[in-house]
Amino acid sequence: MNIIIFSLMTISFLRARFGYEKEILPMMDTASDKSYLQGPPNPYTATVNPLERLISDTYLKVTGILSHYFAYYQENVAEFRRWFQSIYYEMDDDTRKKILNELNLNLRSMDDLENFWTETQGAILKGNLLELSDLLKGLEEAVNAKTHMSSEANNDLIKSKINFKDKAVDFLNQLNKIYGFLDLGLSYHTSNRFTDVHAMFLDAAASKKKLDKSFESISGIDD
């Protein structure tokens, strides 16, 4: 249920901002379904510039992956729910430690992570990360090209939007940080470091709160 609510909130925001009607399916194997990156035809998307479209594609992809971890921790860890409903965008060390202690309390082997891995679609994470990596590379190239154009511009109106560079770089840094958490979590799972797995996926899920704020800040800045 949390995944569905999470997905509908994300879709509603993108539809309102971009006329965007992609669908996040909670149990969809996005690693094999390449049509996911295209989405259904939409007459409104003609008004969206390529950089905005790439930003929304990448945001939608990463939040689709995070939805499973977000739902798992929301449903199973009361302390995570309390933090997520708080005013804070970053998780403090004490809260993080308390949550991890609870998650790791009964872990004795990799077998104890089987339910977590199934519910969060761990089997398709590698494929999803490959797709996310491609999107991040494309977005980084587009942002670099755009910020270079802004720095060379002489028009005062264009220069007034120079803060786009800072916001875009911050957004990219957050996305790359989340990718790093997910990739390391996968690596820990593959190498049977079962007591380290939750730490990385918790950090990734917690990062969503700040990412949402960054996305709202950057959306429309280049209109």
Curated annotation (Swiss-Prot):
Record carries keyword Signal: yes
Signal peptide: 1-16
GO cellular component, one term: spore wall
Sequence motif HBM, residues: 207-214
Record keywords, A-Z: Cell adhesion, Signal, Sporulation
A biological process from GO: sporulation resulting in formation of a cellular spore
Keyword Signal among UniProt keywords: yes
Top-rank taxon, per record: Eukaryota
Annotated compartments: Spore core; Spore wall; Spore, Perispore
Purpose: Spore wall protein involved in the adhesion to host cells surface. Microsporidian spore adherence is an integral part of activation and host cell invasion which requires the extrusion at the spore apex of a very long and coiled structure, the polar tube, through which the sporoplasm is pushed to enter into the potential host cell.
Domain notes: Heparin-binding motifs (HBMs) are characterized by an XBBXBX or XBBBXXBX sequence, where X is any neutral amino acid and B is a positively charged basic amino acid, and are defined as the consensus sequence necessary for protein-heparin interactions. The HBM motif is involved in spore adherence to host cells.
Name of the protein: Spore wall protein 26
The gene coding this protein: SWP26
